């Protein structure tokens, strides 16, 4: 009888040893690419809480200066997921290798064009009656020297602003420059205007620069998207879904907690990611000015005829007018074959 009990005990121990590796399996490493801004804070905050590990992931986060650089880095860094603006997600050459899997936020109020406080551009407002809050005129903006990041949301805003004023990019002098060095150059006296996105917009305002146009006042929607490496997502859909669960948990935290409570973490995040200072007041403003969307809201946005489709249609038109695309590429962009709502649908 004792021998029988020992055999049973040994069998239980053997089974426990077999199951232990599965129970203690290391989280899957998931590489990701981001900019030092709002959508990245959501992922950073979720990782700080350990929510990536709870989702079975070990999220690594690589920093970049722009969404264009993120997409162009895909071949070199082979990241799995990323956050970037809709313009580079749709129009950058490697965008064919991406899926659009979710919306990180709406940054329409946070892309803006700045001038110095003595700029003649501030002397005219609402010259186009359809856009009463937009500054500038064909006379004051023509031949202006403008610093901007090409093929980005800020470029989309710049082109729209010029169109509102009856101008085109041929009517001004454009200097292609990433936002951080562009703000430094503008501060040093280079250029007549600079196109930026948040949180650099708050730094521009702190320096006394004045906004003459933002995306919201210009009537365009600027969505920041979550994208996935198409090859990786096809091979590991469960990891992409786990990432979305983690990110949606971060969005729920932003919706539930007052911005003032999150500001301390946001200031720390910004310092870690950019090496630059952000005041608690700026952090609160940035959190409050970036709407984020729950899973149910996102599913509605991604539905046929939803707001995502409308916003992407407008950006496709902009991208086609500003790029050299083959008919096949144009058909792909118009067909929005990159949009993959199935990853969101899988985590309902």
Task: Map each language-model feature to its residues.
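Conserved C-terminal helix/tail region of periplasmic/extracytoplasmic solute-binding proteins
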Residues: 309-348
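Bacterial N-terminal signal peptides that target proteins for export
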Residues: 1-11
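Pocket-lining segment of extracytoplasmic ligand-binding domains
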Residues: 181-272
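Solvent-exposed, acidic/flexible segments
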Residues: 36, 63-67, 106, 151-155, ...
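Bacterial N-terminal signal peptides
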Residues: 10-20
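Short, glycine-/small- and polar/acidic-enriched structural segments
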Residues: 26-169, 173-176, 192-195, 214, ...
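Extracytoplasmic/secreted envelope proteins and their assembly/folding machinery
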Residues: 40, 71, 86-89, 155, ...
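Secondary-structure end/capping motifs
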Residues: 234-324
